[in-house]
């Protein structure tokens, strides 16, 4: 209720990312709000959370993916039009994957077909993986690397997307892709003492020795999904 009262943008749609309202809009907070709505719906199915989720999915369809190729943009003008320059051309494979998982979760919660956009985002993001199945940070809308470095969280979102595609289609190719993402995480990012290497450069050099707490969320949820889908 507080989010609706204080942060809802009744003119342009969506919600303010922060208060006071910034001069740019972002899909990322809305993505996490959708995830929260879906989680709330599981424990409070009569609480109206799925209606808010539907509004966010509609925003995804009409605004977030309105740019070339139907890909997920990151930052927008206050009215949700796409800015010029860098923000018009750069997309993040990790977030394409994350929305694939969310769209499958939304379809399951509403007993509706998965939106075709999920396949669009998935196919594009998979095409940007390197030969060993690693996801990089940023690419152009043509799929060319822009920031070829690699973060832990992007690999976890690739794993979740592969698992959601496997669950919805039964295609064993997605199981193989999930195994590849799991191997990347275990062999390169997660350390034996329970930590992780959060950021590699494009050439495999370690860029950061810090372990952001936010990454824990991505790792835990990815492994929870792995256990649920693969019965591992």
Per-region residue spans from a language model:
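Glycan-recognition and catalytic cores of secretory/periplasmic carbohydrate-active enzymes
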Residues: 1-232
């Amino acid at each position: 209720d507080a989010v609706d009262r204080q942060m809802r943008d009744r003119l342009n749609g969506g919600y303010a990312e922060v208060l006071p309202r910034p001069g740019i809009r972002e899909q990322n907070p809305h993505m996490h709000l959708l995830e929260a709505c879906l989680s709330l719906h599981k424990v409070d199915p009569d609480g109206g959370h799925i209606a808010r989720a539907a509004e966010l999915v509609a925003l995804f369809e009409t605004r977030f993916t309105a740019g070339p190729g139907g890909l997920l943009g990151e930052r927008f003008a206050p009215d949700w039009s796409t800015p010029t320059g860098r923000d018009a051309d750069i997309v993040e494979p990790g977030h394409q994957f994350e929305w694939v998982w969310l769209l499958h979760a939304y379809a399951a919660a509403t007993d509706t077909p998965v939106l075709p956009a999920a396949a669009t985002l998935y196919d594009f993001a998979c095409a940007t993986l390197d030969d060993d199945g690693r996801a990089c940070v940023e690419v152009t809308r043509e799929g060319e690397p822009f920031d070829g470095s690699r973060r832990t969280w992007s690999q976890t979102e690739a794993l979740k997307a592969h698992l959601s595609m496997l669950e919805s289609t039964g295609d064993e190719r997605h199981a193989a892709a999930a195994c590849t993402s799991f191997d990347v995480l275990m062999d390169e990012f997660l350390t034996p003492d329970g930590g992780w290497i959060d950021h590699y450069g494009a050439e495999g050099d370690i860029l950061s020795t810090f372990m952001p707490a936010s990454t824990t969320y991505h790792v835990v949820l990815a492994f929870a999904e792995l256990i649920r889908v693969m019965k591992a």
